[in-house]
Amino acid sequence: MARKTLTTALVKKFIPSRKSKSRKGENGIVLVVGGSYIYHGAPILSSIAALRSGTDLVYTSVPKINVASTRSVSPNLIVIPLVDQKLTRGAVNKLLGALPRKLDSATIGMGLAIQEKNALLHLVKSLLDRDVRLSLDASALIPEVLPLLANKNVVVTPHAGEFKRLFGQVPSNSKNERIKLVEEKAKEFGITVLLKGSTDIISNGSTTYLYEKKIPAMTVGGTGDVLSGLVAGLLSKNRKPLESAAAAAFINGLAGKVVQKKLGLHMTSMDLLPEISTVMKPFDKIM
């Protein structure tokens, strides 16, 4: 098993070049599905993070009760209402009918209220059948989804509690044991696992990347939603789950370091969003 610590030089290889004559839509189209009556902000953070990663278009699907508040945050968001307040089979069918033909990646689960597990499974399977790369987080991390994901270009981004719910095992406090468990589960289920923590562990079961953040300000709520948007945004262009997840973790951390230096321990996740552009600019490559 190859293990590597993430560095700027390594991550630069994971960020694709952009053609000087490229057109709108050629640099990534992303779908974000999330939100609920209580957690309206999560998909907003993910969507703006995906845009800041350099994605051309982001479609944000939230319950209809959240549509006005989501649209009011940014004119850059293309909002598709979910017809029900929670994820149902009917809501998924209508969403699938409203999506553009070309869709590169999607992130699902941030703040999402799910009424029917089968609705989530239907959404995941339908997107995978369209060759859409997926990043699953939060509410989407349930064990029932695992049989659909094997070797399908999927990233899961759990924290320790979500890891337990998804895989049925608690990550150890021992760093080495955590790494081994992530590698084991990634290999067993044919997916890329990004276990969030003070050290992010990213593995596809054959290669593992480590990123030790040491950014205590990033315990604030919503940083994981930003990360999910970065994963989806990078996945829409790179299309390699391991590299995209590793780059997303690194960039999220770089942005966090910039914000912590400015604001100390008083940051919010919204503060990360403009800094994504700042820290990603040195990675830009134009062909």
Curated annotation (Swiss-Prot):
(6S)-NADPHX binds at residues 42, 159, 225. The gene is nnrD. HAMAP family: NADHX_dehydratase (MF_01965). GO terms for molecular function: ADP-dependent NAD(P)H-hydrate dehydratase activity; ATP binding. AMP binds at residues 196-200, 224. Its EC number is 4.2.1.136. Homotetramer. The keyword Lyase applies. The lineage of its organism: Archaea, Nitrososphaerota, Nitrososphaeria, Nitrosopumilales, Nitrosopumilaceae. Catalyzes the dehydration of the S-form of NAD(P)HX at the expense of ADP, which is converted to AMP. Together with NAD(P)HX epimerase, which catalyzes the epimerization of the S- and R-forms, the enzyme allows the repair of both epimers of NAD(P)HX, a damaged form of NAD(P)H that is a result of enzymatic or heat-dependent hydration. Signal peptide: none annotated. This is ADP-dependent (S)-NAD(P)H-hydrate dehydratase. Its cofactor is Mg(2+). The keyword Manganese does not apply. InterPro entries: Carbohydrate_kinase_pred_CS, CARKD, Ribokinase-like. It is an enzyme of class 4 (lyase). It catalyses: (6S)-NADHX + ADP = AMP + phosphate + NADH + H(+); (6S)-NADPHX + ADP = AMP + phosphate + NADPH + H(+). CDD domains: YXKO-related.
